[in-house]
């Protein structure tokens, strides 16, 4: 058990100046979109996964236990199902490698949106609020929550690529 008493934050209204939404959205788009466009599956893992996705989408192997050349899939099925489903739905409109990446780009965008909203809701709670100043000037609840959510989103973007090649 932690015996140290909590040390609440002292945050001024000036410290939580609003980050322009357009700038934040452009930054998120610059993070998500390059992983979708202008590249082919050239790494070994990309080629292998794409091969299974394409075989599933074309009906050359069963969805429940996909194989290529008699070799069973050694990784999780869900990502391959998502890619195969996207290929089946989108391949008449776009090429198969791009179609296979679309659900993963959407999932990454969803993670970014949900992280921002979760941090925003958490920072709006009474327990998360900074201490009020004796003569005013403390951060407004919504402005403080927005600044914390922006920081959480930027921290996620900064560290996600370090954990795994996400795009």
Tell where the protein language model's regions lie, with residue ranges.
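Membrane-integral, polyisoprenol-dependent glycosyltransferases
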Residues: 2-167
């Amino acid at each position: 058990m932690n015996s140290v008493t909590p040390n609440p934050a002292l945050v001024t209204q000036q410290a939580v100046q609003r980050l322009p939404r357009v700038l934040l959205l452009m930054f998120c788009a610059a993070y998500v979109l390059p992983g979708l466009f202008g590249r082919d599956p050239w790494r070994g893992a990309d080629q292998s996964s794409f091969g299974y996705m394409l075989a599933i989408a074309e009906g050359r192997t069963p969805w429940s236990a996909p194989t290529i050349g008699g070799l069973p899939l050694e990784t999780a099925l869900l990502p391959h199902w998502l890619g195969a489903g996207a290929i089946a739905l989108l391949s008449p409109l776009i090429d198969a490698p791009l179609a296979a990446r679309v659900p993963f780009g959407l999932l990454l965008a969803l993670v970014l949106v949900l992280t921002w909203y979760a941090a925003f809701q958490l920072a709006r709670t009474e327990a998360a609020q900074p201490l009020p100043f004796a003569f005013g000037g403390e951060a407004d609840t919504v402005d403080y929550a927005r600044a914390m959510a922006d920081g959480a989103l930027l921290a996620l973007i900064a560290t996600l690529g370090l954990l795994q090649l996400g795009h």
